[in-house]
Amino acid sequence: MRVEIIFLGCGGGRWATITQKKATGGFRIHTNELRMHVDPGPGAIVRLNELKISPWRTNALFISHCHPDHYTDGEIIVEAITQGMTKKRGVFLGSLSVVEGFGEYEYVVSKYHQSKLEEVRVLYPGDSAELYDTTIKATHTKHGDPFGIGFRLSTIYGDIGYTSDTEFIPQLIEDFDGVRILIANIVRKKNERIKGHLCSNDAIDLINSMNKKPELLIMNHMGVKMTNPQIEAEYISQNTGIEVIPARLGLKVELLNGKYKYQLIK
């Protein structure tokens, strides 16, 4: 049995995306049955091939909200899922804005591409869906896209949480209490808070408010002003008592029975 997370970058926000000083390819979650790509921003398909991860084996796509650092390679991932649009295959999960569009937010995967998938589903916070050998539950956010979602994925070896882009709101405490691994989109360091996003101090408050803290926090979606992620990870760890590591291109985290391990793949 396997449960693993592989990062195709760690950057987020307009400046990090434009400069590509931190890659913005999102991340993958692989289990025995699931091969899910989460938030494939610019360069996702390039990073997959660089790391020699087969895009063709992908069978699920999750896009959290309608900002380009999360969705731009989505249609290419769909083309991989569907074997070059030749087979009706795979699952696409996303927020209302992502899948159907709403107001100024247009859907980000074309109806043509959506038509080639076996299942397309809109998720709202609190919604759950069976996803191969896992269960996914959408979580709350407060961000520019009012329909944005994160998720909590239940696997054979415990739960993985993903905040997506959000500022600190009380609902996050319940959403992620008890997950084994939490992937938190932390754009800025210390108390340098900006609207719609978490800073390091927000992550500390979130972790310390939980009844059962995660075993591991992974810092993701870091902006250009997050100049020394390792020092920031140590700061968060010192103030929460849990292990904290920054994501980076090629980081692979394996969730095992009663433990976890991580390494860098190239």
Swiss-Prot record:
InterPro entries: Metallo-B-lactamas, RibonucZ/Hydroxyglut_hydro. SUPFAM superfamilies: Metallo-hydrolase/oxidoreductase. This is Uncharacterized protein MJ1374. It comes from Methanocaldococcus jannaschii (strain ATCC 43067 / DSM 2661 / JAL-1 / JCM 10045 / NBRC 100440).
